[in-house]
């Protein structure tokens, strides 16, 4: 089984080609293509309005020396720290929505694993993951580029992410 570090490296490669300075047309930033909501969850950012549109008009909180989106793009250590914090937060969301009840099941020939769930949540959030699971794959949301949750759940199924999830 692959390690957490391999999971992060492979996720970063899938999201941005591993480019810490990547910034896409939807406003997602860095190696892991994190948006405003992700950086709020990781404790790096506060949104002024209620709308999450990745316009970065909120306030950076200075965590790890990050005071702007440019600081974030120029700080690989902050991006790695933010991703670990965010993954732990996502795991909590997945637990809350009941996604862990599906661990070990097979949906559309794909084994449901902790790392697959985390990858699916990275792409579209825990709410979209539970829709996929509850409908046994009939509702399979995609991101703005057409990438499906199912493809992430499958691609990232074989990693040991117990440093994030703890013992299950």
Regions found by a protein language model. Name each.
Residues 29-35:
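Active-site nucleophilic cysteine motif
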Residues 2-25, 37-168:
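Non-catalytic cell-wall polysaccharide-engagement segments
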């Amino acid at each position: 089984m692959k390690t957490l570090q391999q999971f992060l490296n492979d996720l970063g490669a899938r999201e941005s080609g591993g480019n810490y300075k990547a910034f896409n047309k939807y406003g997602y930033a860095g190696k892991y293509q994190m948006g405003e909501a992700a950086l709020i969850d990781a404790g790096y950012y506060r949104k002024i309005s209620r709308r999450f549109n990745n316009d970065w008009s909120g306030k950076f909180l200075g965590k790890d020396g990050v005071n702007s989106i440019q600081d974030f793009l120029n700080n690989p250590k902050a991006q790695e720290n933010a991703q670990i914090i965010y993954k732990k937060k996502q795991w909590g969301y997945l637990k809350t929505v009941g996604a862990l009840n599906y661990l070990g099941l097979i949906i559309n020939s794909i084994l449901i694993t902790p790392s697959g769930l985390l990858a699916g949540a990275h792409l579209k959030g825990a709410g979209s993951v539970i829709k996929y699971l509850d409908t046994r794959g009939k509702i399979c949301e995609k991101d703005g580029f057409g990438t499906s949750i199912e493809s992430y759940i499958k691609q990232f199924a074989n990693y040991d992410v117990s440093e994030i999830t703890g013992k299950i």
